Amino acid sequence: MALQGPIPVEFGLVFPAGVYAAGAFEPVRDFEASASGRFVQSKDKATGVPLWVVEVIDADHTARARTVKVKVAAQAQPVLPAGPAGSPFVPVEFTGLTVTPYVNQAGRLGYSLKASGIRAPGRPPGRPGPEGRESAA
């Protein structure tokens, strides 16, 4: 089969109504390497770069899952773009988005989402934002 591993997808195809970050990025725990209270951060299998995860809220009111976790590989903790003043939710877009299908413990098809970077919505790829650079891996 020609398709193996993560499948590249456009952000708008996965999230046509956009998403809102519901908190900051957290390190992904490597459950096999972490033991007896010792935390080990998971690394990207292809690059060896540390993995971070952020929970996002799908703005599509018809979406089956309202919240989704998206992983980003980056040497340092990614920073969310500035959001609207006074709002706990930050609109974001992911760059270099991939989806990896898998069968979950209940025997149902699930999807893992991973991105190479994050930015404010509506900004063309590679164009710096107000912070002067695109947050990415």
Predicted regions and their residues:
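OB-fold and OB-like single-stranded nucleic-acid-recognition modules
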Residues: M1-A137
